[in-house]
């Protein structure tokens, strides 16, 4: 555990078209894995919330790192199209500054 963490995080929120959840999760997962492995992302999580809202929390080393990653060509254009097709409504993103971080990631014993 660490009392301070990444200084930049973003919360994304969407409403999805009915029946598009599986397609969205697949596309979101593909893009998130590529951003993590190739574009400097520190990782992200996808959550389903109440009232049909979906949330993604993404961490980056800095706002500049995210801006640089998003300025490049899409990490997977087809997954991007698939994700956009599943979204009925995108709500404004919320930029967050980490103040204290005690999140523990499970160890992968595989």
Question: Language-model features: where?
Answer:
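Short, well-ordered beta-strand segments in beta-rich or mixed alpha/beta enzyme
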Residues: 8-15, 44-73
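Short, surface-exposed ligand-recognition loops at beta-strand->loop->(often short) alpha-helix junctions
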Residues: 15-26
